[in-house]
């Protein structure tokens, strides 16, 4: 029951964030919109920011749950950027309310997991070679997250598919061919 209530609150908050900035949404707005009491909200979350964090954690679980292979890495990466595009208002609103660092943490987690699964599934490494692979994962994590944050900052001027196509061209010529 608690998970159902949390999902209703999350869905309602996303809907409200289509129309208002997070800073202008009150607990009262949220609870009235989804028909639950303020106490029900506070039984599940400390505040609206706690709910936002829960939403990202839940959505991250869904994205991270995918198995990444050499054959489907483009689809896995696309799902991260498609999530951002599909949740545009929520993501932009979060970006404006929490700042770049919050989304950077979320994206770093997703992209690092994605790259680690991709690379370590394809190769077996030890010692110095493992350190180089870990460095490469960090390097590409920061590159992809930087591109993603820039895309968000510019209010997503291209589609997720167009962005992925550009990323694929770069990655196919470098990280994938190196391992």
Question: Where on the chain are the PLM-derived regions?
Answer:
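Alpha-helical bundle regulatory/interaction domains
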Residues: 1-20, 24-27, 33-179
